[in-house]
Amino acid sequence: MKHVVFAHRKLSFGGGERVLIARTDALGDLLISLPVQARILSRFPSAEIHWLVRSYSAPLLQEHPDITGVHLRTEGQDLCALFRQIDPQIVINLGHRDREVITAAKQAGVPVRVARARGLDQILAATDLVWRGRYGSGRHEAMNTLDFLRPWGLDGGAPEPPRLYLSEAERHQGELDLAGFQGPRLGIFLRGTGAGAHPSGAWWTAAQAMFSAQGWTPLILGPPELSGLPASDLRGLMARMRACDAIISPSSGPAHMAAALEVPLVCLMGLRPNHTPDRWAPLGSGVQVVQYPPPEADLSGGMDRLDPAVLLPHLQRLQQPQTRPGR
């Protein structure tokens, strides 16, 4: 018989279960899913956490002390064989597009398979389904991911802000990469592949002049083709971000990365109903969110209505003394 979240099926951890969490879409999606791991381990610290992710997002999880294994999702792979090798007792598929995950988990004999109720094959293969809708609820996406833990009674409440980790050598290299830039350093991402809105080049030129006049040293970290810094991989970019005193970025993967690295962040967001701060703002105490004035506009135009001077009080607030581990 099919079990659904609304049926309030109660499962329990016996201790030492191997849990595989699948999140095979964008960087930001993976980052807002980390509270699922944190919630499990806060109640059951002996659980063993594995992740199934894409190769482009896997570097985010390096050095994370709570992760036992990171496994790559590739095209055409034998997922059933992978699951038999890992031998998890639980598979949680947080993304709704990669429906092969749950069907392969069933073929591999995984006892508990939790997924969103999307796609007939996935619905039939899951043991527990999440039917709750994501849109128009006013809930943050991180809260939506915690819904997948309802069979264990671990859903609800505020999600723990995601955290990313760097090695001492990586932090040192990040400081070396930016040694030529006098502090306070203001790292800038002009746009992101997943950004809901971003200003034009002319807007950024005016904004950087204003930031410089206020004593900041702006440096463009991304996109790579517009940065004057040598090319770097994702871990190197994370280290450079950590070496900055603050980051300004449209809402995209880098914004969530900055918050998870505990770098003070000003996040620029648009007005689309499905991309509001309530749903997608990066999580963390050092995050300031700025939206452009209404009405809604195309992704690259509406943000130009925002006066760059509006950002200055946010940057001043982020300059207030705060503790940043490892810096």
Locations of regions flagged by a protein language model:
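Catalytic machinery of carbohydrate-active enzymes
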Residues: 1-327
